[in-house]
Amino acid sequence: MNLRPLHDRVIIKRLDQESKTASGIIIPDAAAEKPDQGEVLAVGPGKRDDGGKLNAPDVKVGDRVLFGKYAGQTVKVDSEELIVMREDDIMAVVQK
């Protein structure tokens, strides 16, 4: 991947959603909702405050994060679908 996010932007790869329910029902791709979890692939340097101080992002590469269904902008890079979003659009980091 040759993307370097700017400012407080983060590049995320959606995690694959289960295609089968707990009861064994297979969900077709057309009916499945886009997952709202992903892995952080790249993080920008941060956002500057009004005084010009750079605030480092709270997320780091490798974090598993939760975000809204419509958060960010989907881009295709090297035939891979990625999401570019602001750090503010990330709701939580999933603790392991």
Curated annotation (Swiss-Prot):
Signal peptide: none annotated. Its main location: cytoplasm. One of its GO terms (molecular function) is protein-folding chaperone binding. It is found in: Cytoplasm. InterPro entries: Chaperonin_GroES, Chaperonin_GroES_sf, Chaprnonin_Cpn10_CS, GroES-like_sf. Transmembrane segments: none annotated. Keywords: Chaperone, Cytoplasm. Together with the chaperonin GroEL, plays an essential role in assisting protein folding. The GroEL-GroES system forms a nano-cage that allows encapsulation of the non-native substrate proteins and provides a physical environment optimized to promote and accelerate protein folding. GroES binds to the apical surface of the GroEL ring, thereby capping the opening of the GroEL channel. This is Co-chaperonin GroES. It comes from Polynucleobacter necessarius subsp. necessarius (strain STIR1). The gene is groES.
